[in-house]
C-alpha cells in the first residue's frame, strides 16, 4: 500500500517542515500550559500545539461563518477538529493526486476525546452555555466535519481505541484499499488536550512533573500532548498517476490484545509482542530486517518495561535502532499513532533516525538502549511503529522502502 503524502501538526511544529526541523535540532515541545483552562497551569508540563484556537482557525482556513455540518460561527469548532483539518489537508496537498475527484476517496480518522473541549466550555458556563458546543462532543463529529471541508464524499468512519486509535485507522484504511472498496484513504488521527484527559491521567499518577524521559531507568511518567497526523494511502492504480513515485509502502499491520488490565500493559508484554510479531509476518519480514523502531515509549514504569520486554523477546540478540519521539511531542493519545506514522514514513523517505531526548540511565531489565542523537543518511529499508493503548489494545505498523 503506497504512502503518497503525509501531514502533521504537533507541539514541535504546525507542518511537516517545522516538525522535521525540531526533530533534527532536538527541540522538544513541552512547556507550561498556555491554552487549556485548568488549575494545573504552571504545575504540570504538557506538549500543546503552539497556537490559540483562533490561530488554528486561520491555519485551517475557516472563516467567520463555518460552512458544513458544524454550522455556526468561528470559535465554536472543537480544537480536535481544527487540528485534524490542518494535518489532513497538508497530507492531501503533499500527495498531489491528479484529478482526485475521479477516485473513490475516503477518510478514516481516529480520536479519543472528540469535541470534549467544547463540551467542557459549555458546562463551565452553566445555563449560559451554547448547546451547539455539545453537538460536537462525540468522536465521529470531527471526522464528519473534516470530510465535509475536504470534499470527501465516498466514505468516512471514526476509530477510537485509546492510544492505538490512529494506528488502527491506518491499518483499516489499508484494508479498504486492499479489498477494492476505495482508491485513496486519508488515514490517521487527532486529539486535543482537555481537562478530562489531564485530570484523568493525573488521577492515575502517571504524569511526570518534569519533561518525560522514555526508556530511561529513572523515568517518572509521561507528558500529555496534542496534535494530528495523517497519511494518504493509495492503490497501485492511483500511485501510477503520481508525478513523483512513492518511496514508501505500508507493508504490514497487526492489532492484538493482551486482555490484562484496563489501564496497564501485561508485565510480559504479550500483547505488544503479538502485535509486532504478526505485523512482521504480514509484511513478509524477519525481525533482523527492521532498521528502526519508533517506540510507543510513553515514559511510564509499566509501559516502557512491557514494551521493552516484548522487543527483547522478539528481536534478541540483534536489536535495531530505536527511540521514542514522545520525548518531543508528548503522548498525543489518539493522535500518537498518526503522528508517529508520519515520522516513520519520513525516516524511510530520508534515512533519518530520531533521538530519544533526555535519556541518561539504561533500564537494568533491558539489554539495549535507545538512540540519543539525530542520525542522517541511514540506509533504512523497514521501520516499525508501535502504538499500545489502554485496555490492552496493541497495534504495530511496518513501513518499507519501495523496491526499485
Residue locations for each model-derived region?
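N-terminal amphipathic, basic-rich helices that act as targeting or association modules
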Residues: 1-3, 10, 74-90, 99-101
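Structural signature of cysteine-dependent C-C bond-forming condensing enzymes
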Residues: 94-108, 124-131, 144-155, 178-185, ...
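Conserved small-residue
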Residues: 5, 23, 88, 107, ...
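Condensing-enzyme catalytic core mediating Claisen C-C bond formation in acyl metabolism
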Residues: 1-4, 27-32, 40-44, 207, ...
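Glycine-rich phosphate/pyrophosphate-binding beta-alpha loops
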Residues: 11, 112-113, 162, 298-300, ...
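Active-site-adjacent elements of ketosynthase-type condensing enzymes
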Residues: 42-47, 118, 192-214, 255-274, ...
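ACP-dependent fatty acid/polyketide chain-elongation machinery
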Residues: 1-70, 237-249, 342-356, 400-404
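Conserved catalytic cysteine-centered active-site region
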Residues: 30-86, 104, 112-172, 181, ...
